[in-house]
């Protein structure tokens, strides 16, 4: 019975897009090679600076600056000529894995590195692929290990206990400060009790609510009225109060004698359509007809 082969392990972003990786690598190698060539020419000019013209050296410096700026732009675009700026996220998301290690000299590797690397062995892979810490970090770790081994066990225990005590005191102090801030924020009232009680009393009993009184408008000032000219009378206007006592006296005599009051055109003032008669006060009764007993029935 034959069993199927197990599927290969799935690794995230492991050469998922080999074409883009190859294109980005070629672009980066090209930019780095151009910058390296200019740097070599500048180093030769500095060795022969007495014989080298300064304008040519300044031109090389400007060319190197433009190449370095183009290299930085290519790194921001992950080596893609027409990509967007992701600041190398595409290159960091892909893993470089060593496919073969050998101690024999490799001509292709020598030609690519210009003779700096003879073979891809176990001693070079950790340094170039950064799979182990830097030598400076290793030296610091060795110094710490040496100091620890030089001290006695009792001294180390006492120092550890003192450090733990100081750290615990610092942590407790920080926790107490945080707790105090939290309690102060929780206990701080967000309302005023007096204002709340005042609002409740005003809603339930109407306490503290004042009604706004509206002031009555002032009465209009009275002005003297004049009579309009009649069709048969004079054209000049006459005041109303001129014929008022005689007219009221004749009406009063007619009412006391039992007859119907007669209105006379001579006694009635003529008013215009827009004017109304206004009397400032009631005229007194005629003193000759004060008592109704003098008239006969």
From Swiss-Prot:
Listed under GO cellular component are: core mediator complex; mediator complex
Mind telling me which Pfam families this protein's record contains? Med8
Positions of region (Disordered): 204-297
Tell me which domain of life the UniProt entry assigns to the organism this sequence originates from.
Eukaryota
Q: Locations of Polar residues compositional bias?
A: 285-297
Q: Name one GO biological process term.
A: regulation of transcription by RNA polymerase II
Q: What are the protein's UniProt keywords?
A: Activator, Nucleus, Transcription, Transcription regulation
Q: Name one GO molecular function term.
A: RNA polymerase II cis-regulatory region sequence-specific DNA binding
**Chief location:** nucleus
Localisation: Nucleus
Keyword Transcription regulation in record: yes
Composition-biased stretches (Low complexity) = 223-239, 248-262, 271-284
Described by its record, this protein's role is as follows: Component of the Mediator complex, a coactivator involved in the regulated transcription of nearly all RNA polymerase II-dependent genes. Mediator functions as a bridge to convey information from gene-specific regulatory proteins to the basal RNA polymerase II transcription machinery. Mediator is recruited to promoters by direct interactions with regulatory proteins and serves as a scaffold for the assembly of a functional preinitiation complex with RNA polymerase II and the general transcription factors.
The UniProt entry's sequence similarity note says: Belongs to the Mediator complex subunit 8 family.
The protein depicted here goes by the name Mediator of RNA polymerase II transcription subunit 8
Q: What is the lineage of its organism?
A: Eukaryota, Metazoa, Ecdysozoa, Nematoda, Chromadorea
């Amino acid at each position: 019975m034959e069993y199927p082969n197990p599927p290969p392990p799935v690794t995230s972003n492991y050469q998922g897009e080999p074409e883009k990786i190859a294109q980005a690598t070629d672009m980066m190698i090209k930019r780095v090679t151009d910058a390296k060539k200019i740097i070599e020419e500048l180093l030769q000019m500095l060795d022969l600076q007495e014989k080298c013209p300064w304008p040519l050296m300044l031109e090389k410096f400007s060319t190197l600056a433009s190449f370095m700026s183009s290299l930085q732009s290519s790194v921001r675009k992950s080596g893609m000529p027409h990509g967007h700026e992701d600041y190398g996220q595409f290159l960091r998301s892909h893993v470089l894995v060593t496919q073969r290690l050998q101690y024999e000299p490799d001509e292709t590797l020598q030609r690519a590195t210009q003779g700096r690397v003879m073979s891809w062995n176990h001693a070079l892979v950790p340094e170039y692929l950064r799979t182990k810490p830097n030598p400076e970090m290793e030296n610091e770790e060795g110094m710490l290990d040496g100091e620890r081994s030089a001290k006695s066990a009792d001294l180390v225990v006492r120092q550890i206990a003192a450090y733990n005590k100081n750290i615990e005191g610092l942590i407790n102090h920080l926790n107490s400060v945080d707790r105090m801030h939290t309690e102060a924020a929780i206990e701080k009232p967000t309302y005023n009790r007096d204002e709340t009680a005042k609002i409740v009393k005003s809603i339930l009993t109407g306490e503290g609510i004042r009604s706004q009184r509206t002031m009555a408008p002032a009465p209009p000032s009275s002005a003297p009225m004049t009579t309009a000219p009649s069709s048969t009378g004079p054209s000049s206007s006459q005041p109303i109060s001129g014929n008022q006592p005689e007219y009221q006296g004749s009406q009063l005599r007619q009412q006391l004698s039992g007859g119907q009051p007669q209105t006379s055109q001579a006694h009635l003032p003529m008013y215009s359509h827009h004017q109304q008669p206004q009397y400032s006060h009631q005229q007194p009764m005629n003193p000759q007809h004060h008592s109704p007993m003098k008239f006969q029935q």
